[in-house]
Amino acid sequence: MLKGFKEFLSRGNIVDLAVAVVIGTAFTALVTRFTDSIITPLINRVGVNEQSDLGILKIGIGRGQSIDLNVLLSATINFILVAGVVYFLVVVPYNTLRKKGEVEQADDAQIVLLTEIRDLLAQTNSNSSGRHEAPGTAGTPPPNYGPRADT
């Protein structure tokens, strides 16, 4: 039972997935800190004046309460940064490698097909006695359609 579990964990797909999750989590934390410490303070300063500390992205709704759109904008920027990096550093290279593998497989299939055609042509040429016949009709006499009308 332990051996089967060890084989399951040692498969390439599981290990790759685990590495991707760990790296993705670490990268998400990095981008979140970048957004929280640099982007959000810059967004908070937009539209702030001396009379109010509410910017254009904070809407006061009374009694000291406000709707803070800065948090939503920061989360959106965070998502776009993570999605962009994952797309350009993981998805694009993966698709490129996958297409390259498909081309190599197609080349192998073409080579096999061309080899079969070559072998069939060589076999046909070695069996031919100067007369070309359709496959499967060797040795059958031509059909007799009776006397020709032009004779």
Swiss-Prot record:
One of its GO terms (molecular function) is mechanosensitive monoatomic ion channel activity. Residues 125-151 are annotated as: Disordered. Keywords: Cell inner membrane, Cell membrane, Ion channel, Ion transport, Membrane, Transmembrane, Transmembrane helix, Transport. InterPro entries: Mechanosensitive_channel_CS (IPR019823), MS_channel (IPR001185), MSC/AndL (IPR037673), MscL_channel (IPR036019). One of its GO terms (cellular component) is plasma membrane. The keyword Flavoprotein does not apply. The chain crosses the membrane at residues 12-32, 71-91. HAMAP family: MscL. PANTHER family: LARGE-CONDUCTANCE MECHANOSENSITIVE CHANNEL, MECHANOSENSITIVE CHANNEL MSCL. NCBIfam families: mscL, PRK00567.1-3. Channel that opens in response to stretch forces in the membrane lipid bilayer. May participate in the regulation of osmotic pressure changes within the cell. This is Large-conductance mechanosensitive channel. The gene is mscL.
